[in-house]
Every structure is written in C-alpha cells, then in structure tokens.
C-alpha cells in the first residue's frame, strides 16, 4: 500500500503491516496499490477523544508469530486517541479469550472461516458482543481476525 500525504510523505507500507494515521488539524492523503500485484487493505476509522492535535502517521510490521493463536494488541505499538483497543490474531487452532463484560466488542474475519461463540463466520463477516465474558473461537481453517475492544 502506498501512502502519500500533503506533508510530503510517500511511504510504501509492506503486506501485513498496520498503519496508524491521526489527521489532527488536517492533512490530505491517498492510499493505493504501488505495484502490479493485486492487494487488499482494510481502512478502519475510530472517532478520537482529542481534537486539534498535530497530524500523526506511523506504521508497524507485526509478524505472523506476534499473532499466531493469540490476540496481539495493535494499540500497544500504535496507540489511538480513544478508550479502545484493536487486537489482531491468526488462528490455526481453537482459542478462548477472556473479555471484560462491561465493555463492547466486535470481531471481524479478515480471512478464513471459524465459529465464534457458536456463530459461523467467513471472510468479511463480523459479530458484536455486549455483556459477554469470553470469546470462544473454533477454527474451520486458518483464520485472521481483528477484535475491537470498545468503551
């Protein structure tokens, strides 16, 4: 993914990396494919709890090992201006994850196929959780998922 912005940055973000951008006081930007190889990327927007700040752009490469059969907290390396966390995992085996039942959660299947709390999900599906104390993932084939932990 190629990132270009009005502050003069031109960056090629490698496959599997996570990019964080906070537009703050304002920035114009574009994201696009920098090669002839087809690519796919997700763009997620979370409303900040701080405004009129300096624009920030950074990225981090998370490895497969960082995410294999566990949730990796993306927001530890790339903090966001909100009471929220983004977690990412690649699952090849069944997995249970404890939740705080006072928070809200949303899980999105980036790729693969799995059952989450007895709901069958495939690539592109999502499921929300309120007042739950755990997520039980049963893999049907290798699955990559993003878990949103929200206020």
Predicted features along the sequence, with ranges:
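Jelly-roll (double-stranded beta-helix
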Residues: 1-151
């Amino acid at each position: 993914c190629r990132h270009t912005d009005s502050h003069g940055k031109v960056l090629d973000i490698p496959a599997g990396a996570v990019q964080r951008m906070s537009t703050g006081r304002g920035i114009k930007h574009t994201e696009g494919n920098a090669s002839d190889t087809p690519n796919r990327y997700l763009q997620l927007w979370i409303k900040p709890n701080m405004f009129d700040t300096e624009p920030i752009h950074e990225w981090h490469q998370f490895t497969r090992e960082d995410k294999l059969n566990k949730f990796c907290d993306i927001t530890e390396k790339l903090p966001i201006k909100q009471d929220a966390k983004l977690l990412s995992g690649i699952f090849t085996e069944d997995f249970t994850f404890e939740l705080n039942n006072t928070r809200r959660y949303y899980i999105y299947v980036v790729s693969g196929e799995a059952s989450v709390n007895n709901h069958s999900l495939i690539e592109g599906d999502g499921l929300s959780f309120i007042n739950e104390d755990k997520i039980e993932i049963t893999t049907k084939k290798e699955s990559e998922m993003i878990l949103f932990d929200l206020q």
